[in-house]
Amino acid sequence: MDSSSSSSAAGLGSVDPQLQHFIEVETQKQRFQQLVHQMTELCWEKCMDKPGPKLDSRAEACFVNCVERFIDTSQFILNRLEQTQKSKPVFSESLSD
């Protein structure tokens, strides 16, 4: 999601909560699709030497490993961001008081 999309979504405070939820869900779907596209491109470049009629065992193992490492790394980053976010004081709450 780019900054214009996030600023548009942030300005939806007066919009119907169902619409806001729908937009959030669609944004999450878009992020997931972008992630899958990035993973596919990365693993394809890394694992496919010469496309052929069949996937050889080396390429198959490479794809499996690539996807697993990508998922592990993504999960690690998400967990780290979550920990960082929990440890920082929430400025928006303190500003509204």
UniProtKB/Swiss-Prot annotation:
What subcellular compartments does it reside in? Answer: Mitochondrion inner membrane
User: Biological process GO annotation list?
Assistant: protein insertion into mitochondrial inner membrane
Instruction: Note whether Endoplasmic reticulum occurs among the keywords.
Output: no
* Classification via Pfam families: zf-Tim10_DDP (PF02953)
The way it spans or sits in the membrane comes to: Peripheral membrane protein
List S-S links within the chain.
Answer: C43-C66, C47-C62
- Which GO terms label this protein's molecular function in UniProt? identical protein binding; metal ion binding
For this protein, the record's InterPro entries field holds:
Tim10-like (IPR004217), Tim10-like_dom_sf (IPR035427)
Span of the annotated motif Twin CX3C motif: 43-66
Q: Name one GO cellular component term.
A: mitochondrial intermembrane space protein transporter complex
Query: Phosphoserine modification sites?
Result: S57, S87, S94, S96
Annotated keywords = Chaperone, Disulfide bond, Membrane, Metal-binding, Mitochondrion, Mitochondrion inner membrane, Phosphoprotein, Protein transport, Translocation, Transport, Zinc
Described purpose of this protein according to its UniProt entry: Mitochondrial intermembrane chaperone that participates in the import and insertion of some multi-pass transmembrane proteins into the mitochondrial inner membrane. Also required for the transfer of beta-barrel precursors from the TOM complex to the sorting and assembly machinery (SAM complex) of the outer membrane. Acts as a chaperone-like protein that protects the hydrophobic precursors from aggregation and guide them through the mitochondrial intermembrane space.
Q: How does it assemble?
A: Heterohexamer; composed of 3 copies of TIMM8A and 3 copies of TIMM13, named soluble 70 kDa complex. Associates with the TIM22 complex, whose core is composed of TIMM22.
Q: Tell what the record comments on domains.
A: The twin CX3C motif contains 4 conserved Cys residues that form 2 disulfide bonds in the mitochondrial intermembrane space. However, during the transit of TIMM8A from cytoplasm into mitochondrion, the Cys residues probably coordinate zinc, thereby preventing folding and allowing its transfer across mitochondrial outer membrane.
State the similarity comment.
Belongs to the small Tim family.
**What is the name listed in the Swiss-Prot or TrEMBL entry for this protein?**
Mitochondrial import inner membrane translocase subunit Tim8 A
